[in-house]
C-alpha cells in the first residue's frame, strides 16, 4: 500500500483565495518509510496572506516570500512522487493520509496542482483519503457523552 502522509501550512483558510507556504510529510510504502519531505514554498503570487495564518505558523510575510518559487517546488514534489507512483497507471496511486485532510489540506493541494498547470491530481492520488479525524469518530462515539 502506498501512503503519502502530509500536512500543509497555508496563508489562510480558503483554498480558492489563500495559498500553501509549507508542505511536509512522508512516503510510506508497505509499512516502510521511504522518504520524508519538508518543502518551503512561496505561495501563489495571487494568494492573499492573512496575519492569523502566519501567526499560527510562526512565520512572516518576508520569510515566505523568500522561499523557493512555487513551480520549482511543485517540480521537486512531483519528481519525488514519480519515484513511487506511475501516474499513467490507473491502478498505481497514493492514498493521501493526515488529520482533517478531507476538509482542508486536500482542497489546497489540489488547487496547488491546478495553479501549477496540472489538472491530473487524480493521476497521483486515490480519490478517497485516510483522514485520522474521520477515523477517530467511530472510536470516540461510545466515549463521548450523547
Give the label of every model feature segment:
Residues 119-132:
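Short, acidic/small-residue loops that bind anionic groups at enzyme active sites
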Residues 129-145:
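Short alpha-helix plus adjacent loop in nuclease-associated cores
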Residues 113-117:
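Short, surface-exposed basic-aromatic patches at helix termini and helix-loop junctions that form
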Residues 1-112, 123:
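Conserved non-catalytic scaffold segment of RNase H-like nuclease domains
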Amino acid at each position: 500500500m502506498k501512503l503519502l502522509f502530509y500536512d500543509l501550512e497555508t496563508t489562510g483558510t480558503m483554498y480558492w483565495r489563500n495559498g500553501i507556504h509549507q508542505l511536509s510529510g512522508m512516503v510510506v510504502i508497505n509499512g516502510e518509510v521511504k522518504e520524508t519531505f519538508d518543502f518551503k514554498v512561496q505561495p501563489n503570487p495571487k494568494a492573499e496572506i492573512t496575519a492569523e495564518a502566519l501567526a499560527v505558523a510562526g512565520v512572516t510575510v518576508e520569510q515566505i516570500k523568500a522561499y523557493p518559487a512555487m513551480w520549482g517546488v511543485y517540480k521537486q514534489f512531483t519528481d519525488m512522487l514519480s519515484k513511487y507512483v506511475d501516474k499513467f497507471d490507473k491502478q498505481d496511486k497514493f492514498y493521501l493520509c493526515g488529520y482533517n485532510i478531507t476538509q482542508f489540506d486536500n482542497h489546497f493541494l489540489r488547487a496547488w496542482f491546478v495553479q501549477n498547470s496540472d489538472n491530473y491530481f487524480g493521476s497521483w492520488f486515490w480519490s478517497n483519503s485516510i483522514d485520522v479525524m474521520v477515523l477517530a469518530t467511530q472510536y470516540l462515539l461510545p466515549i463521548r457523552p450523547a
